[in-house]
């Protein structure tokens, strides 16, 4: 039996796919840079070997699954090609893997990961389900009937998939290094829609998705009256959100989610719509929606000292706006401080004013240096260009996160798609030191 070797195994999709193959009984290993990523925890728990990149890792008998961030000139891929080993790109392998399942591809400019996680949780509790989530979580469930997968639009990679269903959460202009306009993004989504076998579930409040023209049913969901599945009577509380769902004007049920913001209501509504279409019991769906704990790096909360720290993947103006609004709902009486690390120079330059406008919805804004992706290392833009447009003109360094101590009782949002977690980790050390120092002072006073 071949061994599957993942080039770039710490990538979120790659990590999830490796876990799926491992669960299905295949031998799996992989390589990546010698730096800790949150995705590797699950790999280590499953005892999947992780090596540092080296051509010496590539031996006879391997099947290579190559991450899309790595060109054919990468040393491991070059060695594999020299040896005549099969080399398959991640998205193409996944496209082959989902055949034979009732597959559900979740895509959209925003909300893919959260919706895939929610769908996997709900459907997986009702029927055997394999899933691949973009937070690095994957499961190859034995006897699975369904396969839920996050489908990324970047470079049209999702066109490798021919799923049974697709959920389209929204269309927005992102990845400006590849997509030239929102029309370009729309064309990619419509092309995917034409490959879907049974039905597409699409946000009907999205003007772009309303333009879809397909030969299969398009089931629209949203807040508007014209949607087949409509969310109404939304009640936003500090513990979560309640709402009623109507299907073609008929009351379907009252639902509750332990999540915040309109975007999470819409994510849940898409899942409810698909489950109803598939005939899954509505009471089971209600029950499972209540117990979803979220996905990694999406409004992940840590309470420390007298502050609330939130880790979030938001890296587009629309996502920042949604994250700030969610924080306002859950913590209406607290000050909201945004700590943002822009991801890629191209995206930052393209949406510079949009970033400023969304960040300024917070009470205070701190900016980290721009994170260049694997595709792009340099740019003429600097973080100062964005800082000049935001409240306070604050730039924060990893070595000086103590500035955030100025905001007791605040919610601090650490947002970005790069490695903004290191800023949170540095700040948590500052908080730990402050707590220890305070304890020492109290001890000295007693003595």
From Swiss-Prot:
Molecular function in Gene Ontology: ATP binding; UDP-N-acetylmuramate-L-alanine ligase activity
Coiled-coil region(s): none
PANTHER family recorded: UDP-N-ACETYLMURAMATE--L-ALANINE LIGASE, UDP-N-ACETYLMURAMATE--L-ALANINE LIGASE-RELATED
InterPro entries linked: Mur-like_cat_sf, Mur_ligase_C, Mur_ligase_C_dom_sf, Mur_ligase_cen, Mur_ligase_N, MurCDEF_pg_biosynth, UDP-N-AcMur_Ala_ligase_MurC
Keywords of this entry: ATP-binding, Cell cycle, Cell division, Cell shape, Cell wall biogenesis/degradation, Cytoplasm, Ligase, Nucleotide-binding, Peptidoglycan synthesis
GO biological process: cell division; cell wall organization; peptidoglycan biosynthetic process; regulation of cell shape
Official protein name in the record: UDP-N-acetylmuramate--L-alanine ligase
EC number: 6.3.2.8
Superkingdom of the source species: Bacteria
Protein's cellular compartments: Cytoplasm
The organism of origin for this protein: Listeria monocytogenes serotype 4a (strain HCC23)
Function: Cell wall formation.
Cellular component, GO annotation: cytoplasm
Gene3D superfamilies: Mur ligase, C-terminal domain, Mur-like, catalytic domain, NAD(P)-binding Rossmann-like Domain
Classification lineage: Bacteria, Bacillati, Bacillota, Bacilli, Bacillales
Alphabetized SUPFAM superfamilies for the sequence: MurCD N-terminal domain, MurD-like peptide ligases, catalytic domain, MurD-like peptide ligases, peptide-binding domain
Residues that coordinate or bind ATP: 108-114
Family statement: Belongs to the MurCDEF family.
Reaction equations catalysed: UDP-N-acetyl-alpha-D-muramate + L-alanine + ATP = UDP-N-acetyl-alpha-D-muramoyl-L-alanine + ADP + phosphate + H(+)
Pathway in which this enzyme or protein is active: Cell wall biogenesis; peptidoglycan biosynthesis
């Amino acid at each position: 039996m071949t061994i599957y070797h993942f080039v770039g195994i710490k990538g979120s999709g790659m990590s999830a796919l490796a876990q799926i193959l491992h669960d299905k009984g295949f031998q799996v290993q992989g390589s990546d840079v010698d730096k800790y990523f949150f995705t590797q925890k699950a790999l280590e728990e499953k005892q999947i070997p992780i090596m540092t990149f080296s051509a010496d890792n590539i031996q006879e008998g391997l099947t290579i699954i190559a991450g899309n961030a790595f060109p054919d000139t990468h040393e491991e891929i070059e060695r594999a090609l020299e040896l005549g080993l099969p080399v398959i790109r991640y998205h193409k392998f996944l496209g082959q893997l989902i055949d034979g399942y009732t597959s559900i591809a979740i895509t959209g400019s925003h909300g893919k990961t959260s919706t895939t996680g929610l769908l996997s949780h709900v459907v997986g509790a009702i029927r055997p389900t394999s899933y691949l989530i973009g937070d690095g979580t994957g499961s190859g469930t034995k006897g699975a009937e369904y396969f839920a997968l996050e489908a990324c639009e970047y470079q049209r990679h999702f066109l490798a998939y021919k799923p049974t269903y697709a959920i389209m959460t929204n269309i927005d202009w992102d990845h400006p290094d590849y997509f030239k306009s929102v029309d370009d993004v729309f064309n990619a989504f419509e092309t995917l829609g034409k490959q879907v076998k049974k039905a597409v579930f699409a946000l009907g409040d999205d003007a772009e998705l309303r333009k879809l023209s397909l030969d299969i049913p398009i089931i629209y969901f949203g807040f508007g009256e014209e949607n087949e599945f409509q969310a109404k009577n939304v009640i936003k509380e500090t513990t979560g959100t309640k709402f009623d769902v109507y299907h073609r004007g008929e009351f379907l049920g009252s639902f509750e989610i332990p999540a915040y913001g309109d975007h999470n209501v819409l994510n849940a509504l898409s899942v409810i719509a698909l489950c109803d279409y598939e005939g899954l019991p509505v009471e089971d769906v209600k029950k499972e929606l209540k117990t979803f704990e979220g996905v990694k790096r999406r409004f992940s909360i840590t309470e420390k000292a007298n502050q609330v720290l939130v880790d979030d993947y938001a890296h587009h103006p629309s996502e920042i706006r949604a994250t700030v609004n969610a924080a306002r709902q859950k913590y209406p009486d607290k000050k909201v401080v945004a700590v943002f690390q822009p991801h890629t120079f191209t995206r930052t330059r393209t949406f510079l004013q949009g970033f400023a406008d969304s960040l300024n919805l917070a009470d205070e804004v701190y900016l980290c240096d721009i994170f260049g992706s694997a595709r792009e290392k340099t740019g003429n833009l600097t973080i100062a260009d964005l800082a000049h447009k935001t409240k306070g003109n604050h730039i924060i360094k990893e070595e000086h996160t103590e500035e955030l101590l100025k905001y007791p009782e605040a919610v601090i949002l650490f947002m970005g798609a790069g490695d903004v977690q290191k800023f949170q980790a540095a700040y948590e050390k500052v908080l730990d030191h402050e707590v220890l120092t305070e304890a020492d002072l109290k001890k000295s006073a007693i003595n």
